[in-house]
Amino acid sequence: PAAEAAEVQQEQTAAPAEQETALPADAQTAGEPEQQLTYVALGDSITSGVGLADMKYNIAQIGYDLRPNFEGYSSQCYTALVGKGLGLDRQHAINLGLPSLMSPDMVDMVQSSAMPKMNQASGSYYVYPEYQEYLRKADIISIQIGSNDALVPCIVGLGEATNWKSEQLAGLMVSGALRDFNFQKLGLFLEALNRMVLTFDESRATNRLLFRGMDEICDQAYTNVTNSLPQIVAGIRALNPDAKIVLLGYTNPVPLLPAWNRYFSKLNRFAKDLAAQEGLIYVDIPRTQTAADGHP
C-alpha cells in the first residue's frame, strides 16, 4: 500500500545522501593548497639583515622605513633561512627586524605597534599598524633583542668622549661598509681612524669610557633588557596565546671588552631561565661569527 511505497521512496532518496557523507576526508580536501605555518621574526638590525646587499628599505622622514623588508628581505638573513627550512613562502615568513631597536622600544611595538616618540639615543622611530596584526596571525614568533641596549649608549658615550670625532668611524662600522673585510675596506677604516686625532682630555675620557664606563653601560643595559623581555613575552601572549615563542641567545660582537663578555653571558643565562619559567623555546647561538660591522 501507499504507506509502504512512501517508506521505500524515502529510503531510496536517503541513500545518495549517506553515500555522499561517507566520502573519505582526504577525497573531500583533494586539490586544496596545503596550509602553511606563519613564522614572524622580531628583532633589531641583526634580524633585519643590515650589511647584506639585498636588504630592502626606504628613506623615511625620520630614519628608515623597513616595510619593504618585511617580506622582501635578503635571501641570506636568518628569517629567509628558517622560512626555507620550514617550506614557507614570503607571506608566511615575516621579517620584523628594525635596525637600532632597543628592548624598551620592542615593548612599545608589541603593545601598540608604535614607538610613542623617537629614541633620541639611537635615532630610530617606528610606527607600523600592521606589526600587531602579524603577531596575531603567527604560529611561531622568535625574539632577538638586547644588543643595542649596550651598543647605542657605547657609541653615544664614545662620541661625547671624543667631541664626536668618532662619529664617522662609528657610522662606518655599523653601516655594513666594512663587511667582508679586504684591503680596500682596511683603507676606509684607517682613513676614518686617522681623522680621530684626540686631545689629551679626549684620550683620557675615551680610556675612562673603555675601562670603567663600559661596566656602567652594560649594567644599565642588563637592567633594561631583563625588565623588557618579560613584558615582550606577555604582550605577545595577550595578542596570540597559542603562538610558540622562541628566545634567541646572544653572541658578543665586541669580545675584547670584558664588560661585554659579562653582559652577554648574563643575558644568555637570563633568557634561558626565562624560557624555562614561561614555557618558551631557548636557542643558544654560541658559534655565531660576526663581521667587522658587528652583524652575523
Question: Where do the language-model regions lie?
Answer:
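Second-shell loop/turn segments in exported
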Residues: 64-71, 215-222, 259-260
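A structural motif corresponding to the C-terminal end of an alpha-helix
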Residues: 81-89, 228-246, 270-284
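Serine-esterase "nucleophile elbow" of acetyl-processing enzymes
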Residues: 21-99
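Catalytic His-Asp segment of secreted/periplasmic serine-dependent ester chemistry enzymes
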Residues: 250-296
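Oxyanion-hole/transition-state-stabilizing segment in secreted/luminal serine hydrolases
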Residues: 50-52, 105, 111-220, 252-254
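Structural recognition of the beta-strand scaffold that forms the well-ordered cores
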Residues: 38-41, 47, 93-97, 140-144, ...
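Stable alpha-helical elements in mature extracytoplasmic
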Residues: 74, 78, 127, 221, ...
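Sec-dependent signal peptide cleavage junction
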Residues: 1-6
